[in-house]
Amino acid sequence: MAVGKNKRLSKGKKGIKKRTVDPFSRKDEYSVKAPSTFQIRDVGKTLVNRTSGLKNANDSLKGRIFEVSLADLQNDEDHAFRKVKLRVDEIQGKNCLTNFHGLDFTTDKLRSLVRKWQSLIEANVTVKTTDDYLLRLFAIAFTKRRPNQIKKTTYARSSQIRAIRKKMTEIMQREAASCSLAQLTTKLIPEVIGREIEKATQGIYPLQNVHIRKVKLLKSPKFDLGALLNLHGESTTDDKGHKVEREFKEQVLESV
């Protein structure tokens, strides 16, 4: 007989069931707040395990990234094809204060833009904002028919594509390097850069559907709580200090 564990002895009683614990009873709910650059500040709720022992709930929340439709943040269905990434940087009570972490297009929108009989032009540029955020911007554009054009196709020549791509990189570099991350976000929402590119390249070849299709955050500067609170409109710092009244003054004895 082989020496080993006796399975019959180790078995428990058949009628006893294990006590099930609801995992949500150990979790807390936190509100996710978007920066003040967006119209709708309340993004939603997120769950996290309660602070117990050395495990802190705040540490688990910091660094979380949420992907939200820009249509929900701006309360406008015209922005439904764009997704914004928000990263949790600070916890204030039961609120998670987020910052802009990136932007992207939905796959179905990108697929719908690509059509026959036109040239697709793409460009990307790596740029640093005035508040030291390193970003990579990706632009996309398509050629369109000139006024009174009879020919079906609108293919641009290689020299024209190179000239358009150069203009695209120059405009993206100029617009992003001259402002902070919050100011760049306000430019990205109404697609100011896309319209600027369309206007600048009119003399080379007419373009349509010019978009900044993606913004990728490569590197962030050292975390600044004051800047984040200003971004959320919750800064309480004043230029002047408040006078402190002394209620009790200690008497100094001349001789002991």
From Swiss-Prot:
An example GO BP is: translation
Q: Which domain of life is it from?
A: Eukaryota
Q: Using the record's annotations, give every residue carrying the modification N-acetylalanine.
A: A2
Report the GO terms under cellular component: cytosolic small ribosomal subunit
Transmembrane regions listed in the UniProt entry: none
| Record-level Gene Ontology MF annotations | structural constituent of ribosome
The record's similarity note reads: Belongs to the eukaryotic ribosomal protein eS1 family.
Q: PANTHER family in the record, alphabetically?
A: 40S RIBOSOMAL PROTEIN S3A
Q: Which HAMAP family match?
A: Ribosomal_eS1_euk (MF_03122)
Q: What is this protein called?
A: Small ribosomal subunit protein eS1
